[in-house]
Amino acid sequence: MKRFLNCFMLIIFITAFCEAKVNQWDKMKEVYENIPLPTFPDKTYLITDYYNGTDSLYTSAINKAISVCSAQGGGVVVIPDGVYKTAPIRMKSNVNLHLSDKTLLMFTTDYNLFDTVLTRIEGIDCYNISPLIYAYGETNMAITGNGVMDGMASEANWFSKERIDGVTLKNGKKVAEKTVLYDLKEDSVPFEKRVFKGKTGMRPQFINLYKCKNVLLEGFTLNRSPFWLIHPLLSENITVRKVKMQSHGYNNDGCDPESCKNILIEDCDFDTGDDCIAIKSGRDEDGRYWNIPSENIIVRNCRMKDGHAGVAMGSEITGGCYNVWVENCLMDSPNLSRIIRIKSNAIRGGEVKNVYVRNITVGQCDESILGMEMKYWHVDDGPYPPYFHNIYLENIKSNKSRYLL
């Protein structure tokens, strides 16, 4: 049945709506104006100048061009038109990695070519095989251009890995790598001893920015990711603009800022196998160890074609989530379960507050405009009950959904 849902002044645990609404949208403008974009010297480095002419992969050429560019004060590393295959790329400060219009960058699925790096997998700190593009502690960076990057993930490689490889326990039982990671977290094993590499490595993210600042991701297309597509982690001042995300594998979230501050996601296209955007801040004891929220997140002018939720907060939200603005987005898919979804449980905990949503057009979604779950994953009890408050929705129009809330 066709339903028209005009949710002007839908208030969840809110008082003084009109006054707060005006002030908070003004605050969004302040946050936006204080997210700096990176700048680069007018110097160009072609990856083909660093290619030896014999390697089957361009990994060495790309990473050497990036290292030289950064060491010489920065500039633009250009991947010219053409098809290139590579292992993981390591980004560095003051480098703009630019994909030309007709560039196709394909990533190998041979995990033996992947280094081991510090990251988080589903909110749990560990060392894992490297994301396809990784940066740690870098500043003033960009990945730009209209080219395509293909993670090559399929059932023939990454998505069957957990079933085929896994980890063999002392009793001979084989379990998935993430099951071992969950157990290490529950046993409070230190981060540096949670190491997954080579055959025991878990599916990596496409782009992982760990403790980075002042980063621009703009223009390119991401296809077939092994895991989450864009994962800023413990980072600040990140702009994701005009990026097309097309990936329908398991856990293929589009953009997941985790324990981040000042994030702008605008004019992007999401066609993903999981949440289009999922804001996170760590999980359980790891999240409480860091206790760093995600805050000041702006999502605007985006198109969500497919995915589980349009914009989610959680479920790994232990560190909290504050000040989220979502506006002027189009969401339309029978596979979108909820337009806005907030999820946690009494083990993960976390406070979510000050979420402002307006001017959203929904062609259809499967379940509801807003979903809030405090017993996510069927967890009824625990010592850390989550707290969701100050959630505002205004001018949400849906042609088809089973429920409002």
Report residues per predicted region.
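Alpha-helix capping and helix-loop boundary segments enriched in small/acidic/polar residues
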Residues: 53-56, 252, 256, 260, ...
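Right-handed parallel beta-helix
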Residues: 101-102, 139-147, 213-223, 236-247, ...
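The right-handed parallel beta-helix/beta-solenoid scaffold, focusing on the short coil/turn
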Residues: 43, 75, 82, 87, ...
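Extracellular beta-rich repeat passengers
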Residues: 317, 336-405
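Active-site-proximal loop/turn and secondary-structure-junction residues that shape catalytic pockets
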Residues: 83, 234, 281-283, 315-317, ...
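Extracellular "leader-to-stem" segments immediately downstream of a signal peptide or signal-anchor
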Residues: 2-6, 10, 16-78, 83-96, ...
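Short glycine/acidic-rich loop motifs that flank beta-strands on beta-rich extracellular proteins
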Residues: 74, 86-88, 108-109, 129-130, ...
